[in-house]
């Protein structure tokens, strides 16, 4: 089975430290990403993920290669085999370029490889870019002073899994009345 890598990038109108802190609230991903249904923390270094990309897929991930305010990385330890890195590059004093690189082994063996070659991978990469753009829009639309990394309740996008009611019961319980 082959490993495939997909990338996306966006420049966000906020300083790198704020973007980094907001992005690393993984349990908020269902609020702005369309295919992430749940992210729950097992401890400070490991998390459980549920996604709906051509079917439902789950995995556990461990944090790797983190550099505060600059980079986050991960690799799966069970479930869907994947790993990746997200970098946060300051652009002047008030902007941040976010680069995402995600690599995975498609599930279903030869069928997964065939799907990747027939366009599933391209569609996934486009959705990854769209969701990253949603994150940038949400950060940009946040009122001045509301970019508090400890309070990200405003992070909802109309195309998100949360807004469409596609999150899991476990994820819903972490979002309280905001889902």
Task: Pin down the residues of each PLM region.
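Hydrophobic ligand-binding cavity/cleft-lining segments
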Residues: 1-44, 160-179
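Short, surface-exposed coil-to-beta transition loops
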Residues: 5-7, 57-61, 81-85, 97
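A short, structured loop/turn motif at beta-sheet edges
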Residues: 16, 44, 65-69, 88-97
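Hydrophobic pocket/interface hotspot
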Residues: 19-23, 29, 47, 63, ...
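A structural signal for short hydrophobic beta-strand segments in well-ordered beta-sheet cores
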Residues: 39, 63, 86-88
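Short beta-strand segments that buttress and anchor functional surface loops
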Residues: 47-52, 72-78
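Beta-strand/loop substructures that line and gate deep hydrophobic ligand-binding cavities in soluble
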Residues: 77-132, 137, 141, 146-150, ...
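Intrinsically disordered, low-complexity mixed-charge segments
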Residues: 141-168
């Amino acid at each position: 089975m082959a490993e495939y890598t997909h990338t996306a990038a966006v420049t966000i109108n906020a300083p790198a430290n704020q973007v980094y802190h907001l992005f690393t609230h993984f349990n908020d991903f269902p609020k702005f990403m369309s295919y992430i249904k749940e992210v729950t923390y097992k401890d400070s270094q490991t998390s459980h993920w549920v996604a709906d990309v051509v079917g439902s897929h789950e995995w556990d991930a461990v944090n790797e290669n983190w550099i505060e305010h600059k980079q986050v990385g991960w690799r799966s330890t069970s479930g869907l085999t994947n790993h990746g890195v997200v970098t946060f590059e300051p652009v002047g004093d008030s902007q941040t370029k976010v680069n995402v690189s995600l690599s995975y082994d498609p599930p279903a063996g030869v069928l997964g490889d065939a799907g990747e070659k027939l366009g599933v991978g391209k569609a996934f990469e486009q959705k990854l870019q769209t969701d990253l753009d949603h994150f940038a829009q949400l950060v940009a639309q946040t009122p001045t002073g509301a970019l508090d990394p400890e309070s990200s309740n405003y992070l909802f996008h109309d195309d998100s899994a949360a807004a469409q009611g596609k999150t899991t019961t476990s994820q819903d319980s972490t979002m309280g009345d905001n889902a």
